Amino acid sequence: MQVKATAKYMRVSPQKVRKVADAVKGKPVEAGLNVLQFMPQKSAAMIAKVIRSAVANAEVGGVDVDDLVIKGVIADQGPTLKRFRARAQGRGARILKRTSHITVVLEQ
């Protein structure tokens, strides 16, 4: 049985999330959370939160939590916030603040 959890509009770029996500794919839930706990990246805490949410979803569904494995962590692009930075001689530079939709799929 598959269990999903999603976090939307997270303020980190999908490219950075994917680098951390590759470290936990295919691992049991406890091992994956342990790996994420010691990673310095901002997205590691975000992914850990979504994994814990998926485990809670599994408990509600009556699935044995000890047997769950992280089947996949998907980081999709969310909407981009566009900001402006003033530059020299009246110019402006666009700053793109990217967001992510993080989906975790657990499998028994």
From Swiss-Prot:
The keyword Lipid biosynthesis does not apply. NCBIfam families: rplV_bact (TIGR01044). One of its GO terms (molecular function) is rRNA binding. Gene3D superfamilies: Ribosomal protein L22/L17. GO terms for cellular component: cytosolic large ribosomal subunit. SUPFAM superfamilies: Ribosomal protein L22. The gene is rplV. It comes from the Bacteria. Pfam families: Ribosomal_L22 (PF00237). GO terms for biological process: translation. PROSITE patterns: RIBOSOMAL_L22. This is Large ribosomal subunit protein uL22. Belongs to the universal ribosomal protein uL22 family. It comes from Desulfatibacillum aliphaticivorans. Part of the 50S ribosomal subunit. Keywords: Ribonucleoprotein, Ribosomal protein, RNA-binding, rRNA-binding. This protein binds specifically to 23S rRNA; its binding is stimulated by other ribosomal proteins, e.g. L4, L17, and L20. It is important during the early stages of 50S assembly. It makes multiple contacts with different domains of the 23S rRNA in the assembled 50S subunit and ribosome.
